[in-house]
Amino acid sequence: MNKGIVLLAAGGTGGHVFPAEALAHTLKARGYQVHLVTDSRAERYAGKFPADEIHVVPSATIGSKNPISVVRSLWKLWVGLRTARRLVTKLKPVAVVGFGGYPTVPPLLASTGLGVPSIIHEQNAVMGRANKALAARVKAIAGGFLPPANGQYSEKTVATGNPVRPAVLAASEIPYTPSQTGETFQLVVFGGSQGAQFFSSAVPAAICLMKDEQRKRIVVTQQARPEDKDSVIASYQKLGVKADVSPFFGDMASRIGEADLVISRSGASTVSELSVIGRPSILVPYPHALDHDQAANAAALSAAGGASVIKQAELSPQKLSSLLSSALAEPDRLSATAAAAKATGKPHAADVLADLVEAIAEGRSVQEFKKKNEGVGA
């Protein structure tokens, strides 16, 4: 049974695409066709995204103070809006869901302008610029870490959690069994979907300072930018540490599932996946994130005892080496941290968000949805 088309719009980074992918799987299972609007950056994820069709619509962010750049961006947005209006008119979706990032602006402006029931999903604890620009126009706002008491938009905000992909749910079934003294210790290091330059130097430097008997236990999976990959590999080879280093791992969820400890940034999708899988982590919020959203994302997990959060400026090689040495020596503490992380997870977020999408598509209000689903997003 074909229930119609749901159009998903997401910026082309993992933080936006992954929750959209999770919702797409759920909607497809319920009988909907799913189309994705994104930008060219999303090509690396396209193979696993269960879309009936993927559309690239022109868009741009207006961040420059250069008048010529601003004019170019405005023109690109105008072209994108016209393209998106034609697409929405042609597809006639029953609902449109935006997941943030500037590529979502044209399709959401088009859908709301044409009267199509529309929702935005904000993954972070602090709303991003694209979603802020669209918040007043949409029927509902779904939040990952966004508080339900969302200021002027509290009435239409639902705390759904961040949808996680089937691969993450599969990894969550792997029980956490911490490495014991003398056993191999699996360390997974990544900086979100695009890697992190800081970790490329900081982690090898920290491992270098560890005692030989501890260093010999460590096996590293590390995401590194293409330009950093060779130097990171060389650093680990010099230390005699086994390491798998790559700019992108298509099976990162299963690698997290096999990890004893994770070191990462604290983007919303990362924190959500760590909590659903239930793995101890050292989170280092990206210091230049707009509105410091990564620090806010990590706060709840840290408060629950599910992660250690360290500012990048305070994380010297000596500090990180000490943290790693303690982790290798205290498997019981790692087990407790893993359990605390898992207790905060929301593995059913995709189902809750899909329920909200169906409610809005059927013309029901957010208040009706909250009343019917008492305790959800209240």
Curated annotation (Swiss-Prot):
* Reaction catalysed by this enzyme: di-trans,octa-cis-undecaprenyl diphospho-N-acetyl-alpha-D-muramoyl-L-alanyl-D-glutamyl-meso-2,6-diaminopimeloyl-D-alanyl-D-alanine + UDP-N-acetyl-alpha-D-glucosamine = di-trans,octa-cis-undecaprenyl diphospho-[N-acetyl-alpha-D-glucosaminyl-(1->4)]-N-acetyl-alpha-D-muramoyl-L-alanyl-D-glutamyl-meso-2,6-diaminopimeloyl-D-alanyl-D-alanine + UDP + H(+)
Provide the E.C. number(s) assigned to this enzyme: 2.4.1.227
Instruction: Report whether Protein biosynthesis shows up as a keyword of the record.
Output: no
This protein's pathway: Cell wall biogenesis; peptidoglycan biosynthesis
What enzyme category does the UniProt record give? transferase
Q: Where in the cell is it found?
A: Cell inner membrane
Q: Which CDD domains match?
A: GT28_MurG
The source's superkingdom equals Bacteria
Protein name, UniProt field = UDP-N-acetylglucosamine--N-acetylmuramyl-(pentapeptide) pyrophosphoryl-undecaprenol N-acetylglucosamine transferase
Give the organism the record lists. Answer: Agrobacterium fabrum (strain C58 / ATCC 33970)
